[in-house]
């Protein structure tokens, strides 16, 4: 899962510890990578964000993040990302359908805004399949 976040973003701060718990619970079958977006900050600011808000998964503060994010948005045909956090999930290089946290009847290729960890876990269980659920 790729999580596009900002150190300034209130929902990003609120869900960081929950994302860490989700990653730890599923670490044998799941990788979570956070990419800073909409800001240019030092690595120290990102470390401080991680320590303050419990974001203990891989965080990238690379200048290449914008290029990666642009490619992801093009891949899923999402025109203008203007809100953080924003997440996509891939399995075997294929973007996965995710529940819409605003409309339970719809699915899409991304999460927009803060998403309840229970919803992400439900989607992860579906993505990882029956073999995973047995482990």
Label every PLM stretch briefly:
Residues 7, 37-40, 62-64, 92-93:
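Solvent-exposed coil/turn segments that connect beta secondary-structure elements
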Residues 13-54, 65-73:
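Structural microenvironment flanking redox-active thiols in thiol-disulfide oxidoreductases
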Residues 1-3, 31-35, 58-61, 86:
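Structural recognition of the beta-strand scaffold that forms the well-ordered cores
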Residues 49-92:
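Short, internal strand/loop/helix patches
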């Amino acid at each position: 899962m790729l999580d596009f976040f900002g150190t300034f973003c209130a929902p990003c701060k609120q869900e960081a510890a929950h994302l860490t718990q989700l990653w730890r619970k599923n670490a044998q079958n799941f990788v979570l990578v956070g990419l800073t977006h909409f800001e240019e900050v030092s690595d120290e600011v990102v470390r401080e964000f991680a320590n303050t808000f419990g974001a203990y998964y891989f965080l990238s503060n690379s200048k290449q993040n914008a290029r990666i994010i642009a490619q992801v948005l093009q891949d899923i045909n999402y025109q203008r990302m203007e809100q953080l956090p924003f997440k996509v999930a891939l399995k075997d290089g294929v973007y996965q359908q995710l529940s819409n946290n605003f409309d339970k009847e719809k699915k899409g290729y991304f999460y927009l805004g803060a998403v309840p960890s229970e919803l992400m876990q439900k989607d992860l269980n579906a993505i990882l399949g029956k073999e995973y659920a047995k482990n």
